[in-house]
Amino acid sequence: MEKNLVCKLVKAMELQKGEVVLLNFWGEDTEIQDLYDFVGAVAAEGAMPMTLLHTNQYERELVENMNGEVPEKWMEQFAIVDTVIDIIEKPAGLPPADLSKEKYPVFGAYLQKLFGAFSKKKKMIQVTMPSDTNAKCVGMEPEAYKERIMKALDIDYAKMKTDCQAKIDSFTGNVRTVRTGKDCVLTLDTTGREWIADAGDGALPCGEVYIAPVEEKSNGKVYFETLSVEEVGVFHDVTVTIENGHLISSTNEEFNAFLKELPENGDVVAELGIGMNPNVTGVLGDSVLDENVIGTFHIAIGMNHLFGGKNVCPIHYDFVATGIVE
């Protein structure tokens, strides 16, 4: 990624002078320059960077040779951290390909310890990078993927914040109605819940407003011209049925099989979001970007306790569609 774009992203994060920022790098040694560019950009904003590496070699050497749990003394170094920035060149949390299977539980416990500590910080920001690995994960050619990500990142962040707030302010009342297809209507109760603007200090690329609806009070149907489920498949002309906050069925048998395999509370409607990024076009099956496409909305199932809901669940799936949100 170009250094000037890194500086633009960090400026949009609105870091405070004197705060401590942990740069959590998920990538390889060949991509390490990106980390160094973030170090410089954070320092230029008056904040102080710390770094934590998660290259395949680092993770393998650490976990293969660990004896016992992560010491609390080691975890204490993160007590001073105000903001965590994940620099994601590869999917965060996946074990190294050559890690011994018997070490998987150790790796999982290590990550759980880190995520538990980081989730309590003032800000957690995830930057999806234009890497070959990320392109492969979404089934796109590297150059096309890089162009799409870079364009999505290179926006006017001040205008994005203004546009997102204007969208939030346009809603009145505590019930949102979503109209899709010819006659599909979904109602969601948002009483007591607050809209959140994702405009530069959450996930990057950004560009959405979202809310956690009351879990038991979503009812109706949603039509998807294309329903993309990460690591499961892409389905066409699908209508899903939601009753009392649960996505209970669909018109596609493969998707129904996916629903049956979800963990407890995995079918709970967890989020309503609206895409706001003018530089992202076309729903291509990449959930990181698809949910930001201007003119789309998305519903999610699974976890929402981290953004105003009460559903605790190990999964979170976003499903993007076109329609009218009132």
Where are these regions (language model features)?
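Compact functional segments
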Residues: G308-E326
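Dual-mode signal for accessory low-complexity, basic/Gly-rich regions
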Residues: K217-N219, S249-K310
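A short secondary-structure junction signal
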Residues: A97-D98, K136-M140, A199-D201, G233-H236, ...
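Oxyanion-binding "anion nests"
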Residues: P205-T251
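Short, glycine-/Ser/Thr-/acidic-enriched flexible segments
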Residues: E28, K90-A92, S131, R193, ...
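Active-site bordering "gate/hinge" segments
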Residues: M1-N219, V229
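Long alpha-helical, hydrophobic tracts
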Residues: M1-V10, F25, D37-A47, T226, ...
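Short polybasic amphipathic segments
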Residues: R176-R179, V238, I248-S250, A321-E326
